[in-house]
Structures are given as structure tokens and as C-alpha cells.
Regions:
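Conserved residues at the C-terminal ends of beta-strands
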Residues: 58, 80, 110
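Short secondary-structure junction motifs
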Residues: 27-29, 72
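Pocket-flanking alpha-helical
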Residues: 19, 35-74, 86-96
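Hydrophobic anchor at the start of a short beta-strand
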Residues: 32
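Short beta-strand->loop
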Residues: 73-81
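Conserved functional loop/turn residues at catalytic and ligand-binding sites
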Residues: 29, 50-51, 106
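Bilobed "Venus flytrap"/periplasmic-binding protein-like clamshell domains
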Residues: 2-26, 37, 84-115
Length: 115
């Protein structure tokens, strides 16, 4: 069994959630257990202690861990999301959307994510 920690539940990982729900991994002989980590610190500690085998997220946490401990065994590898994962969501469908229509609107912006 592979235990995967995720720091953040987000739509950019939808293909992986779909693979899990449709049992695509088990159809190929893999048993994957996706667990939502309570916070980035537990993700690091869980990986180091063996409570999780892998996690997805940005490389920054691994880099910070190596800065504190150059002998740290954590490794950042692979690429799950190939583009900027931030998305714009509206209340109503708008097939004629244009960015200029956002002028004067209030937006919520994500500036820190727990990766």
C-alpha cells in the first residue's frame, strides 16, 4: 500500500481523485491511500517517520527542510501539475467571459498555500 499525503485538496488534482474513485490504480495492481495531512509540518514529519510514503506539493518545503538539515532524506521529484494551479471561479457560468469585466469587482486571491 502507498500512503499519499496531500496538503491541500484542490481541483488541479482532480485526475488523481478520479483515478482513485474509479479504481484505476487498483486495476493496475496499486493500492493507494490518499490522506489529507493536517498541516505541512505533519507532512514532513509523517514522511520522515514513515506514516506516509509520498506527498504532492511544491518543492519549497523540501528546500526549506534541506536548508535546516542538509542530510535530510526528503527529495522533490516529478511534476504533477504542468501549469500554474490557480484558477478563477465565478458564481454563474459566463460563456462570454473577458478579464476586463473583472474591473471594479471584488476578488479573493490565494497568496499562500500549504505545499
Amino acid at each position: 500500500m502507498i500512503t499519499l499525503y496531500e496538503n491541500l485538496r484542490t481541483i488541479v488534482y482532480a485526475p488523481f481523485y478520479l483515478a482513485d474513485k474509479r479504481k484505476f490504480w487498483s486495476d493496475r495492481g496499486l493500492e493507494v491511500n490518499i490522506q489529507l495531512s493536517p498541516d505541512p509540518v505533519e507532512t514532513e514529519e509523517g514522511l520522515l517517520a514513515g506514516r506516509a510514503d509520498i506527498s504532492w506539493g511544491g518543492p519549497m518545503r523540501v528546500m526549506l527542510h534541506h536548508e535546516r538539515d542538509p542530510e535530510c532524506p526528503l527529495v522533490a521529484f516529478g511534476q504533477i501539475v504542468a501549469r500554474d494551479p490557480f484558477i478563477l471561479i465565478g458564481r454563474e457560468p459566463n460563456l462570454n467571459f473577458q478579464f476586463k469585466k473583472l474591473q471594479g469587482k471584488r476578488l479573493a486571491v490565494a497568496y499562500e498555500v500549504p505545499t
